[in-house]
Amino acid sequence: MSMKMGWRWYGEGNDPITLSDIKQIPGVEEIVWALHSKMPGEIWEEAEIKEVVDQIHAAGFDATVVESVNVHDDIKIGLPTRDKYIENYKQCIRNLSKFGVKTICYNFMPIFDWTRTDLFHPVGDGSTALFYEKDKIKDDYKSMAEYIMSFTEKYNMTFPGWEPERMAKLDELFKAYAPVTKEKLWDNLKYFLEAIMPTCRECDIKMAIHQDDPPWDIFGLPRLLVDAESIDRFLTMVDDPYNCLTLCSGSMNANPNNNVAAIVRKHCDRIPFAHVRNIHHFENGDFSEAAHRDCCGETGIIEILRAYHDCGFDGCIRADHGRQ
């Protein structure tokens, strides 16, 4: 088998790009999808899954990769109610397996998913890109959230990880996460994984965690998957072939000290799904997302793809972010 090229699709009514549009992109076999109307902790019902999978199959694509089934905050915080939401998550896994899903991407980031300070930063050629300005990420999480949510309202769409229902409870969430140290978050991640691994084995679905984006603590919130050492810890903490990575070159290379190609070569057998994203770094620590051509950033796209090729990678890989 060889690697499969995927493309993320946000679904009818939430994505201006149609499946017919994606069909025009050479080599794309896999649609990476999700039920974007579902809140973390809710069960994905079989009828809802079937509706989207049928649309994808009718367009001539596979639908084996889901990005993402988000994890409820009670699980991350370690509240007594987490077991209820873990059971719901296990039922999602079972239901997805009935429709051929083999990989579930998820993350374990507290409160915020990906974080950027500018969603439309001018690149210089007339395009725009996501931008992270280090000095803007201080203690004022509300201003950043309001900025990103303004585009949710303007474009009538939901950004993954920035659901309005959750953002309306930011103060409550920060209070709930206050006692959660980095080690406690590791413990809660291990508890979650050990609880769902039997279901993953039963259903033949791999859980593929996305690294923290960016890979450092923000607003006093701990981040776990930030470098090669933390990835080693994650994979050995629950050493199961169904405990895997969604390796994101852009998230990892937001820290230029991370060698993504080396991580690929070390853990290729635990990477069923990969994101290829290029990053341009500034000397002051800011970064911008860039075009995927190797020379447009400092991520080392050629070396990363060579590593996947050399390792015989046979999972799904997709282009990630870039410019608009």
Per-segment meaning from a language model:
Residues D15-P16, I25, I43-A63:
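Glycine-rich, positively charged N-terminal anion/phosphate-binding segment
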Residues H36-S37, N70, P110-I111, P214, ...:
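Conserved beta-strand edge residues that scaffold enzyme active sites
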Residues V65-F99, T103-V123, S127, K134-A145:
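Acidic/aromatic-lined carbohydrate-recognition and catalytic surfaces
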Residues M1-G6, G11-G13, S20, V53-A58, ...:
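Histidine-acidic metal/acid-base catalytic patches
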Residues A34-K50, F219:
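Glycine-rich, proline-tolerant flexible connector loops at the mouths of alpha/beta enzymes
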Residues D15-D21, I25-P40:
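N-terminal ordered "arm"
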Residues I111-N188:
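Extended, charge-rich helix/loop segments that form flexible
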